[in-house]
Amino acid sequence: MNPEEFRAALAAQGIDLTATQEQQFADYYQFLVATNEHVNLTTITAEPDVYLKHFYDSLTPAFYVSALRTEPLTLCDVGAGAGFPSLPLKIVFPQLQVTIVDSLNKRITFLNELAAKLNLTGVAFHHARAEEFGGKRAANREGFDLVTARAVARMSVLSELCLPLVKVGGQFVALKAAQTENELAVSQKAITTLGGKLQADEAFNLPVSNDPRHIVVIDKVKTTPKRYPRKAGTPNKEPLED
Protein backbone atom coordinates (compact mmCIF):
# COMPACT_ATOMS: atom_id res chain seq x y z
CA MET A 1 0.00 0.00 0.00
CA ASN A 2 1.73 3.17 -1.17
CA PRO A 3 0.80 6.61 0.22
CA GLU A 4 -1.68 7.25 -2.61
CA GLU A 5 -3.39 3.87 -2.07
CA PHE A 6 -3.49 4.64 1.66
CA ARG A 7 -5.25 7.94 0.96
CA ALA A 8 -7.74 6.24 -1.38
CA ALA A 9 -8.45 3.37 1.05
CA LEU A 10 -9.26 5.87 3.80
CA ALA A 11 -11.41 7.96 1.45
CA ALA A 12 -13.43 4.80 0.76
CA GLN A 13 -14.16 4.71 4.51
CA GLY A 14 -15.27 8.35 4.51
CA ILE A 15 -11.96 9.68 5.87
CA ASP A 16 -10.41 12.39 3.68
CA LEU A 17 -6.80 13.26 4.47
CA THR A 18 -5.56 16.83 4.11
CA ALA A 19 -2.21 17.56 2.46
CA THR A 20 -0.83 18.36 5.93
CA GLN A 21 -1.92 14.97 7.27
CA GLU A 22 -0.40 13.17 4.27
CA GLN A 23 2.88 14.97 4.98
CA GLN A 24 2.68 14.03 8.68
CA PHE A 25 2.41 10.35 7.73
CA ALA A 26 5.35 10.72 5.30
CA ASP A 27 7.44 12.35 8.05
CA TYR A 28 6.33 9.69 10.56
CA TYR A 29 7.51 6.98 8.17
CA GLN A 30 10.90 8.61 7.56
CA PHE A 31 11.56 9.22 11.25
CA LEU A 32 10.42 5.71 12.23
CA VAL A 33 12.77 4.05 9.74
CA ALA A 34 15.70 6.35 10.56
CA THR A 35 15.33 5.79 14.32
CA ASN A 36 14.78 2.07 13.85
CA GLU A 37 18.35 1.72 12.56
CA HIS A 38 19.64 2.16 16.11
CA VAL A 39 16.55 1.61 18.32
CA ASN A 40 14.47 -1.53 17.81
CA LEU A 41 10.95 -0.13 17.25
CA THR A 42 9.53 -2.34 14.51
CA THR A 43 10.41 -5.27 12.25
CA ILE A 44 8.18 -3.73 9.55
CA THR A 45 10.16 -1.08 7.65
CA ALA A 46 9.31 -1.21 3.92
CA GLU A 47 7.13 1.78 3.04
CA PRO A 48 4.16 -0.22 1.63
CA ASP A 49 4.15 -2.44 4.73
CA VAL A 50 4.34 0.46 7.20
CA TYR A 51 1.47 2.25 5.45
CA LEU A 52 -0.67 -0.90 5.50
CA LYS A 53 0.27 -2.76 8.67
CA HIS A 54 0.99 0.22 10.93
CA PHE A 55 -0.78 3.33 9.60
CA TYR A 56 -3.92 1.88 7.98
CA ASP A 57 -4.26 -0.86 10.60
CA SER A 58 -4.09 1.74 13.39
CA LEU A 59 -7.01 3.67 11.90
CA THR A 60 -9.39 0.70 11.64
CA PRO A 61 -10.99 1.32 15.08
CA ALA A 62 -12.49 4.52 13.60
CA PHE A 63 -14.35 2.37 11.05
CA TYR A 64 -16.36 0.83 13.92
CA VAL A 65 -16.24 3.38 16.77
CA SER A 66 -17.63 6.53 15.20
CA ALA A 67 -17.00 8.71 18.28
CA LEU A 68 -13.28 8.57 17.42
CA ARG A 69 -13.98 10.69 14.33
CA THR A 70 -15.85 13.53 16.01
CA GLU A 71 -15.64 13.55 19.81
CA PRO A 72 -12.82 15.12 21.90
CA LEU A 73 -12.22 11.81 23.66
CA THR A 74 -9.44 11.20 26.17
CA LEU A 75 -7.63 8.16 24.79
CA CYS A 76 -5.02 6.05 26.56
CA ASP A 77 -2.93 3.68 24.45
CA VAL A 78 -1.35 0.83 26.40
CA GLY A 79 1.96 -0.56 25.13
CA ALA A 80 1.91 1.62 22.02
CA GLY A 81 5.50 0.87 21.02
CA ALA A 82 6.23 3.19 18.09
CA GLY A 83 2.88 4.96 18.55
CA PHE A 84 0.35 2.49 17.18
CA PRO A 85 -2.63 2.84 17.04
CA SER A 86 -2.92 6.16 18.87
CA LEU A 87 -0.66 8.49 16.87
CA PRO A 88 -2.14 7.71 13.44
CA LEU A 89 -5.56 8.26 15.08
CA LYS A 90 -4.31 11.58 16.51
CA ILE A 91 -2.98 12.74 13.13
CA VAL A 92 -6.31 12.08 11.41
CA PHE A 93 -8.58 13.09 14.31
CA PRO A 94 -6.68 15.91 16.05
CA GLN A 95 -9.48 16.56 18.57
CA LEU A 96 -8.45 13.38 20.44
CA GLN A 97 -6.43 13.87 23.64
CA VAL A 98 -3.87 11.06 23.59
CA THR A 99 -1.90 9.49 26.44
CA ILE A 100 0.56 6.69 25.72
CA VAL A 101 1.90 4.31 28.36
CA ASP A 102 4.90 2.16 27.50
CA SER A 103 7.33 0.26 29.70
CA LEU A 104 10.42 0.99 27.56
CA ASN A 105 12.02 4.40 27.96
CA LYS A 106 13.68 4.34 24.51
CA ARG A 107 10.21 4.19 22.95
CA ILE A 108 9.03 7.14 25.04
CA THR A 109 12.08 9.14 23.87
CA PHE A 110 11.21 8.33 20.25
CA LEU A 111 7.57 9.34 20.77
CA ASN A 112 8.50 12.69 22.31
CA GLU A 113 10.81 13.46 19.38
CA LEU A 114 8.19 12.28 16.88
CA ALA A 115 5.43 14.42 18.41
CA ALA A 116 7.68 17.49 18.18
CA LYS A 117 8.57 16.67 14.57
CA LEU A 118 4.90 16.27 13.59
CA ASN A 119 3.75 19.32 15.61
CA LEU A 120 1.29 17.21 17.61
CA THR A 121 -0.34 18.84 20.63
CA GLY A 122 -2.64 17.19 23.16
CA VAL A 123 -0.32 14.18 23.54
CA ALA A 124 1.40 12.85 26.67
CA PHE A 125 3.85 9.96 27.00
CA HIS A 126 4.46 8.01 30.20
CA HIS A 127 7.22 5.53 30.96
CA ALA A 128 5.33 3.04 33.14
CA ARG A 129 3.90 -0.44 33.43
CA ALA A 130 0.17 -0.51 32.70
CA GLU A 131 -0.42 -2.36 35.98
CA GLU A 132 1.03 0.62 37.87
CA PHE A 133 -0.43 3.35 35.65
CA GLY A 134 -3.96 2.06 36.32
CA GLY A 135 -3.28 0.80 39.86
CA LYS A 136 -5.72 1.25 42.72
CA ARG A 137 -4.16 4.52 43.92
CA ALA A 138 -3.12 5.83 40.51
CA ALA A 139 -4.37 9.25 39.39
CA ASN A 140 -5.21 7.83 35.96
CA ARG A 141 -7.40 4.97 37.18
CA GLU A 142 -10.82 5.06 35.47
CA GLY A 143 -9.72 8.35 33.90
CA PHE A 144 -10.13 7.77 30.14
CA ASP A 145 -13.06 7.72 27.71
CA LEU A 146 -11.32 5.15 25.54
CA VAL A 147 -8.38 2.80 26.04
CA THR A 148 -6.71 1.08 23.10
CA ALA A 149 -4.23 -1.78 22.82
CA ARG A 150 -2.86 -3.41 19.71
CA ALA A 151 -1.79 -7.05 19.81
CA VAL A 152 0.32 -6.70 22.97
CA ALA A 153 -1.15 -9.71 24.82
CA ARG A 154 -4.15 -12.02 24.76
CA MET A 155 -7.58 -10.65 25.63
CA SER A 156 -7.75 -11.92 29.21
CA VAL A 157 -4.43 -10.21 30.01
CA LEU A 158 -5.22 -7.05 28.02
CA SER A 159 -8.53 -6.68 29.85
CA GLU A 160 -6.75 -6.59 33.21
CA LEU A 161 -4.22 -4.03 31.95
CA CYS A 162 -6.73 -1.80 30.17
CA LEU A 163 -10.19 -1.93 31.77
CA PRO A 164 -9.02 -0.37 35.08
CA LEU A 165 -8.05 2.74 33.06
CA VAL A 166 -11.47 3.13 31.40
CA LYS A 167 -14.13 5.42 32.88
CA VAL A 168 -17.47 3.79 33.65
CA GLY A 169 -19.43 4.52 30.47
CA GLY A 170 -16.24 4.45 28.38
CA GLN A 171 -14.83 1.73 26.12
CA PHE A 172 -11.81 -0.52 25.74
CA VAL A 173 -10.94 -1.16 22.08
CA ALA A 174 -8.51 -3.97 21.26
CA LEU A 175 -6.92 -4.36 17.82
CA LYS A 176 -6.42 -8.08 17.33
CA ALA A 177 -5.42 -10.55 14.63
CA ALA A 178 -6.15 -14.28 14.25
CA GLN A 179 -7.22 -16.39 17.27
CA THR A 180 -9.49 -13.65 18.60
CA GLU A 181 -12.56 -15.91 18.89
CA ASN A 182 -10.54 -18.42 20.93
CA GLU A 183 -9.19 -15.65 23.18
CA LEU A 184 -12.65 -14.18 23.74
CA ALA A 185 -14.04 -17.61 24.59
CA VAL A 186 -11.76 -17.81 27.66
CA SER A 187 -11.86 -14.07 28.48
CA GLN A 188 -15.45 -13.65 29.65
CA LYS A 189 -14.47 -14.09 33.29
CA ALA A 190 -11.78 -11.40 33.02
CA ILE A 191 -14.02 -8.97 31.14
CA THR A 192 -16.94 -9.35 33.58
CA THR A 193 -14.78 -9.36 36.73
CA LEU A 194 -13.07 -6.12 35.66
CA GLY A 195 -16.34 -4.29 34.99
CA GLY A 196 -16.61 -4.81 31.24
CA LYS A 197 -19.20 -6.16 28.83
CA LEU A 198 -18.39 -7.34 25.30
CA GLN A 199 -20.13 -4.98 22.89
CA ALA A 200 -18.71 -6.05 19.52
CA ASP A 201 -16.16 -8.24 17.79
CA GLU A 202 -15.78 -6.85 14.28
CA ALA A 203 -13.91 -9.23 11.97
CA PHE A 204 -12.45 -8.04 8.66
CA ASN A 205 -9.40 -8.41 6.42
CA LEU A 206 -6.79 -5.80 5.64
CA PRO A 207 -6.72 -4.72 2.00
CA VAL A 208 -3.82 -5.92 -0.18
CA SER A 209 -2.45 -8.54 2.25
CA ASN A 210 -5.86 -9.93 3.27
CA ASP A 211 -4.53 -10.46 6.82
CA PRO A 212 -7.34 -11.21 9.30
CA ARG A 213 -8.10 -8.49 11.85
CA HIS A 214 -10.59 -7.96 14.67
CA ILE A 215 -11.70 -4.82 16.46
CA VAL A 216 -13.00 -5.89 19.87
CA VAL A 217 -15.09 -3.28 21.69
CA ILE A 218 -15.77 -3.70 25.41
CA ASP A 219 -18.08 -1.33 27.27
CA LYS A 220 -17.10 -0.38 30.84
CA VAL A 221 -20.35 -0.93 32.72
CA LYS A 222 -19.17 -0.93 36.33
CA THR A 223 -16.20 0.10 38.46
CA THR A 224 -13.19 -2.23 38.45
CA PRO A 225 -12.72 -3.89 41.88
CA LYS A 226 -9.82 -2.34 43.83
CA ARG A 227 -7.76 -5.54 43.78
CA TYR A 228 -7.22 -5.25 40.00
CA PRO A 229 -4.91 -4.88 38.21
CA ARG A 230 -2.70 -7.25 40.18
CA LYS A 231 0.99 -6.46 40.51
CA ALA A 232 3.19 -6.17 37.43
CA GLY A 233 3.68 -9.50 35.67
CA THR A 234 0.87 -11.36 37.47
CA PRO A 235 -1.86 -10.76 34.84
CA ASN A 236 0.36 -12.45 32.26
CA LYS A 237 1.47 -15.33 34.54
CA GLU A 238 -1.94 -16.03 36.07
CA PRO A 239 -4.57 -14.73 33.63
CA LEU A 240 -8.22 -14.45 34.69
CA GLU A 241 -9.44 -17.10 32.28
CA ASP A 242 -12.58 -19.23 32.17
Curated annotation (Swiss-Prot):
Compartments where found: Cytoplasm
EC number(s) per entry: 2.1.1.-
Coiled coil regions, renumbered to chain: none
GO molecular function, one term: rRNA (guanine-N7-)-methyltransferase activity
Origin: domain of life: Bacteria
Main location: cytoplasm
Summary of the function given for this chain in its UniProt record: Specifically methylates the N7 position of a guanine in 16S rRNA.
Protein name as annotated: Ribosomal RNA small subunit methyltransferase G
Species whose genome carries this gene: Levilactobacillus brevis (strain ATCC 367 / BCRC 12310 / CIP 105137 / JCM 1170 / LMG 11437 / NCIMB 947 / NCTC 947) (Lactobacillus brevis)
